[in-house]
Amino acid sequence: MNGTIYQRIEDNAHFRELVEKRQRFATILSIIMLAVYIGFILLIAFAPGWLGTPLNPNTSVTRGIPIGVGVIVISFVLTGIYIWRANGEFDRLNNEVLHEVQAS
């Protein structure tokens, strides 16, 4: 019984669409985050003096601090974007798959 349900889910066009869209979207977001993180690490490795330069002569806050915070903020934003799309389009496709499989 369960084997046939799993097979019907795998054969469902909406399920294949869901898997493809979710994988593509997650890959794009992962590549963006990886590029941001590697860029930050490369700055640390090859331009530590530039990162260590104060933003203002009257402060001890360096360029590296807001850039590091920016990396963290970007990760939160990308996570929020994924959640927003997952709760909308991906959940809709998931529900379509469930209704079609249960109806057949």
UniProtKB/Swiss-Prot annotation:
Keywords: Cell inner membrane, Cell membrane, Membrane, Transmembrane, Transmembrane helix. Residues 48-61 are periplasmic. Residues 1-24, 85-104 are cytoplasmic. It is a multi-pass membrane protein. The chain crosses the membrane at residues 25-47, 62-84. One of its GO terms (cellular component) is plasma membrane. The keyword Electron transport does not apply. The keyword Transit peptide does not apply. PANTHER family: INNER MEMBRANE PROTEIN YJCH. This is Inner membrane protein YjcH. It comes from Escherichia coli (strain K12). It is found in: Cell inner membrane.
